[in-house]
Amino acid sequence: GLVSSIGRALGGLLADVVKSKGQPA
């Protein structure tokens, strides 16, 4: 559903942010 799609998108965005913060830029 729409909510699931939004949740998945937000989850992916959060994962990307955490990954970039965990690595030296």
Curated annotation (Swiss-Prot):
Tissue: Expressed by the skin dorsal glands.
UniProt xrefs under Pfam families: Antimicrobial24
Subcellular location: Secreted
GO CC annotation: extracellular region
Domain of life: Eukaryota
Coiled-coil residues: none
GO biological process, any: negative regulation of nitric-oxide synthase activity
Keyword field: Amphibian defense peptide, Antibiotic, Antimicrobial, Secreted
Similarity comment: family membership: Belongs to the frog skin active peptide (FSAP) family. Caerin subfamily.
Biological function: Antibacterial peptide with narrow spectrum of activity. Active against the Gram-negative bacterium P.multocida (MIC=25 ug/ml). Inhibits the formation of NO by neuronal nitric oxide synthase with an IC(50) of 9 ug/ml.
Name of the protein: Caerin 2.1
